Design a protein with these regions (language model features):
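A short, basic N-terminal segment
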Residues: 1-77, 159, 170-171, 407-411, ...
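The catalytic "switch" region of P-loop NTPases
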Residues: 2-32, 214-374
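Phosphate/oxyanion-binding active-site loops and adjacent basic polyanion-contact surfaces
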Residues: 45-60, 88-89, 117-125, 242-250, ...
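Alpha-helical scaffold elements adjacent to nucleotide-binding pockets in ATP/GTP-utilizing enzyme cores
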Residues: 59, 63, 92-99, 120-131, ...
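P-loop NTPase nucleotide-binding core
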Residues: 72-263
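Short secondary-structure boundary/capping segments
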Residues: 125-128, 320-325, 408
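Conserved AAA+ ATPase small/helical "lid" subdomain
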Residues: 142-187, 333-412
Length: 422
């Protein structure tokens, strides 16, 4: 079935085929971008092909399930993702985040290792708070942030809380510090909250209030920033934690409270580990980061850390680590090597997903052949290339078609040479 495209056909496009018109239309959405930004990680991916890097996806899902079912040991999990540039590591991080949040399986923090720091616990903490303040699931109409969801779930757990008390906690403009102290005491009387940080529970209860001023001070307190007396007034005079060791303690306390509230993992998606080599003292930075994540997962059993980096970088730097740290990184969850070269079948799925998105955005029905205007024979020319190279080649092809105003055969001469064997 064919329908009229939402965008008017470009007068320079000579084909009467509506799908070719869409493909060649310079005003149509871009579908072959090979770059994923940190902001993209927080949105659904209409182009995701779940069969690509299937082993890594299955491993990740198994680790998440083991944490939820309480089948891990007394410490958290570390999963290494190794691959060459352009193999799809950041794309996979995005898929992991969407997998977890679309199924309400936990809370993810995403970060790239691009900043110099002497305290990686603080770096992780700042990125965690940034992540918790983002919308939890952008695939639904719910606009709640992760932090708002957690505070609401914590309030739901308060024993014998009346609806009137709940509404007062949400919207009353007076001082609720005494009430929050009482609610926190009720919570810590429950077995699941008995070991949680009492002051952190109170902070999460303050976060439930419908007051942006309170929300701002909660975020500052969670980041272990110093607070003025005026700031502390909004959060029940809570004492800020500003010692050098406090960020790591805060990370562990937040993970523990998340586990008590919803019995789900706190997941750190740490990307582009190889960027540490661009900083001063790169070997020392690498060691500090590994020390931080191993200590965190040792102390917080519901944490999962996914490390993605270039395989060459990791192989060159792993020898700088003591055996005890290597064992934590590589056991019991063995590193996953991401295959960078795509098969013809995978390439066809990549193209199908992107063409389908294009046609749906322009109000077109689906063509009989979901690869149209491509043929599988044309796409075979891109076999054994990296995902990034394939998308760049397709983007250049579409741009030429737009300039010509017609569909051009997929060009064999435009294929970059395949990467050397590993």
């Amino acid at each position: 079935m064919t329908t009229t495209a939402i965008l008017p056909p470009d007068s320079s496009i000579t084909s009467a085929d509506p799908w070719i018109q869409a493909y060649c239309d310079p005003k149509a959405p871009e579908i072959f971008s090979s770059i994923i930004t940190p902001a993209d990680v927080w949105s659904p991916d209409p182009f995701d092909v779940e069969t690509i890097h299937q082993e890594a996806r299955e491993r990740f899902a198994q680790v998440v399930d083991r944490v939820i079912q309480g089948r891990l040991s007394s410490r958290g999990a570390i999963q290494l993702l190794l691959g060459e540039s352009g193999s799809g590591k950041t794309h996979l991080m995005r898929a992991f985040r969407n997998y977890v949040h679309s199924r309400n399986l936990g809370y993810c923090a995403y970060m790239q290792m691009t900043s110099q720091t002497n305290n990686y616990a603080r770096y992780l903490l700042n990125n965690l708070v940034d992540s918790l303040e983002k919308r939890y699931d952008t695939s639904t109409h719910d606009t709640s942030t992760a932090l708002a969801r957690l505070s609401e779930a914590l309030v739901d757990a308060i024993p014998s809380l009346t609806e009137e008390e709940r509404q007062d906690l949400k919207s009353w403009d007076g001082d609720l510090s005494d009430a929050i102290v009482q609610y926190a005491d009720r919570l810590t009387a429950l077995d699941r909250f008995h070991r949680c940080d009492l002051e952190l529970i109170r902070i999460f209860l303050h976060r439930y209030r419908d007051d942006y001023r309170v929300h701002n001070r909660v975020a500052m307190w969670l980041r272990c920033q110093n607070l003025t007396d005026q700031d502390r007034r909004f959060i029940g005079q809570a004492t800020p934690h500003v010692d050098e060791a406090d960020p790591l303690r805060m990370l562990c306390a937040i993970a523990q409270l998340i586990g008590a509230i919803q019995r789900v993992p706190l997941i750190f998606l740490i990307d582009q580990l190889e960027d540490l080599q661009n900083l001063e003292q790169p070997v020392e930075q690498f060691r500090r980061l590994v020390d931080t994540i191993t200590t965190l997962t040792d102390q917080a059993p519901n944490t999962i850390v996914v490390l993605a980096c270039l395989e060459d970088y990791y192989v060159a730097h792993r020898q700088q680590l003591p055996k005890s740290k290597l064992d934590r990184l590589e056991n019991p969850f063995q590193s996953v090597r991401l295959m960078s070269q795509r098969s013809v079948e995978e390439i066809c799925e990549i193209v199908k997903r992107r063409l389908r998105y294009l046609y749906e955005e322009l109000g077109l029905g689906h063509p009989h052949d979901p690869l149209h205007p491509f043929t599988s024979q044309e796409l075979e020319k891109a076999a054994k290339l990296r995902t990034r190279d394939i998308l760049d080649q397709l983007r250049r092809h579409q741009e030429r078609c737009r300039q010509a105003g017609r569909y051009l055969p997929f060009p064999p001469g435009d294929t970059p040479p395949p990467p050397p064997p590993p």
